[in-house]
Amino acid sequence: MPFVTIDLFEGRSQEQKNQLAREVTEVVSRIAKAPKENIHVFINDMPEGTYYPQGEMKQKS
């Protein structure tokens, strides 16, 4: 049962997230030979100011 977690800065539309989840599900199903109904995609919207690579806050580009 594959679980896929995607962390993105917030700002994508619901349609963009829906399309991303559908396409990721397709790819994982094809490559991992997993039934689509067993694939779970989690999309986490990260507010700006919550990402600190190397201890420095990362701004959206």
Curated annotation (Swiss-Prot):
Keywords: Isomerase
A molecular function GO annotation: isomerase activity
Catalytic machinery residues: P2 (proton acceptor)
Domain of life: Bacteria
Enzyme type, top EC level: isomerase
Gene3D superfamilies for the chain: Macrophage Migration Inhibitory Factor
EC number of this enzyme: 5.3.2.-
NCBIfam families according to UniProt: PRK02220.1, PRK02289.1
PANTHER family attached to this UniProt entry: 2-HYDROXYMUCONATE TAUTOMERASE, TAUTOMERASE-RELATED
Family: Belongs to the 4-oxalocrotonate tautomerase family.
Name by which UniProt lists this protein: Probable tautomerase SPy_1139/M5005_Spy0861
